[in-house]
């Protein structure tokens, strides 16, 4: 039950300002200055850096699960351990696409709205109002004679109201669609030399976008944002997943038996690191000292020392090792997903000792993980079943983390998961933020 008390998170907000991470909850609007845009809170940790979960500690919230196979998004109350609502999605009138395909939730800077991206061979995306948990816009990305297929992952710019997504299922064309976060609609498309763009990310000054391409010829394309054109591309054998280091110095590529580091200043390959397996996703420690690469065929995670740019350890985990997700309240520990369709485990990793502590049993094919800001709960999607897994991660000793249930009501092909503030918390925060110059943000708390 909510109470009406107000939690002053002045320290967290000031920390956000000092670190360059925004803490203001609001929607991007036309005419915003760069300073105003940078003041918006970032709550999406996937293809964008600088997520600021410390600013929302103590805030009431929910987990959202994108149910790719049934056109719904589950709203999960992790305190009750149950789904309290399913948001219904539909395609635009007059279309005849295969239903659903809603793959992943991406929280737009400001925490007021979110997008649901697309995994099927179509160009439809949805805008979710996080104050009502309803779809407020359904739109298509194709334009100017260019057909977009499967805009899977979304990266957000840092200083300007832009976002970018690819087209992973197009085997002939490579396209990046740029969207505006102030209108929440697509802006323009840039053509690439490699097909099936996947993980697109902005440099921290918003001048360039680096993206991997999943189809042949696999590789990396670099786009000049202002000129709206590709300026370079590399062919990289087995190139698939992409990620940015916390300092923005390198764009990392998960390739065939290699991790390729591209210098974002020079646009040149800085280092190719040999690894067993390869092709998985990346997570780096917040201080940038180490990065962790999923090594799919090796059933492991590789530890890369970013000072020496060398592989320093391989930790055996489970079948089809994909990605490490760090607990935001204590980034020493994280959950690593073993994504095989026959896998029913995730591995808890100690990033200080670089060892596996325990395995936790989940549903089939654990794919994506999200923690609440306090680090006491984690949701794990399991696409091979119509349910998700909820984990108690409150123990200081991660060997005591426990599965609460593997039966959170979701849907078949449940994939992307995110933590979002509750509607009550968002409205309270927006109402009590006095002005852009006010360094005190009052956030609604609940017990």
Segments and roles (model prediction):
Residues 9-17:
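Bacterial N-terminal signal peptides
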Residues 20-447:
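Predominantly soluble domains enriched in secretory-pathway, periplasmic, or organellar proteins
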């Amino acid at each position: 039950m909510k109470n009406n008390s107000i939690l002053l998170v002045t320290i967290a907000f000031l920390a956000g300002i000092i670190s360059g991470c925004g803490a203001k909850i609001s929607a991007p609007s036309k005419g915003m200055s760069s300073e105003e845009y940078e003041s918006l809170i970032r709550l999406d940790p996937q293809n964008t850096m600088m997520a600021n979960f410390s600013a929302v500690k103590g805030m009431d919230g929910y987990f959202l699960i994108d149910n790719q196979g049934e056109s719904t998004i589950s709203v999960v109350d992790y305190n009750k351990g149950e789904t309290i609502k399913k948001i219904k999605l539909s395609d635009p009138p007059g279309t005849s696409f295969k239903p659903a395909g809603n793959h992943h939730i991406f929280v737009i800077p400001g925490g007021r709205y979110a997008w649901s991206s697309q995994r099927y061979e179509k160009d439809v995306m949805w805008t979710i109002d996080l104050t009502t948990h309803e779809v407020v816009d359904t739109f298509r990305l194709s334009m100017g004679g260019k057909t977009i297929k499967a805009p899977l992952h979304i990266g957000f710019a840092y200083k300007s109201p832009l976002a970018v997504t690819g087209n992973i299922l197009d085997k002939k064309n490579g396209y990046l669609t740029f969207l505006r976060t102030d209108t929440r609609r697509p802006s323009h498309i840039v053509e690439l030399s490699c097909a099936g763009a996947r993980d697109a990310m902005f440099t921290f000054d918003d001048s360039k976008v680096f993206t991997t391409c999943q189809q042949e010829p696999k590789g990396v394309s670099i786009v000049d944002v202002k000129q709206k054109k590709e300026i370079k591309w590399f062919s990289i054998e087995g190139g698939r997943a992409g990620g940015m280091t916390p300092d923005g110095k390198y764009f990392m590529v998960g390739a065939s038996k290699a991790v390729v580091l591209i210098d974002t200043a020079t646009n040149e390959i800085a280092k190719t690191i040999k690894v067993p397996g390869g092709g998985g996703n990346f997570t780096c420690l917040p201080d940038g000292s180490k990065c962790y690469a999923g090594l799919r065929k090796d059933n492991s995670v590789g530890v890369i020392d970013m000072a020496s740019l060398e592989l320093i350890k391989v930790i055996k985990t489970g079948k089809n090792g994909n990605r490490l997700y760090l607990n935001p309240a204590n980034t020493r520990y994280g959950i690593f997903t073993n994504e095989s369709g026959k896998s029913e485990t995730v591995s808890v990793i100690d990033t200080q000792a670089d060892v596996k502590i325990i395995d936790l049993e989940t549903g089939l094919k654990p794919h994506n993980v999200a923690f609440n800001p306090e680090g006491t709960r984690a949701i794990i999607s399991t696409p091979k079943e119509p349910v998700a897994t909820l984990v108690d991660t409150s123990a200081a000793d991660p060997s005591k983390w426990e599965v609460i249930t593997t039966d959170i009501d979701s849907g078949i092909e449940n994939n992307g998961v995110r933590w979002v503030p509750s509607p009550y918390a968002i409205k309270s925060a927006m109402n009590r933020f006095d002005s852009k110059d006010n360094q005190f943000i009052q956030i609604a708390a609940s017990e």
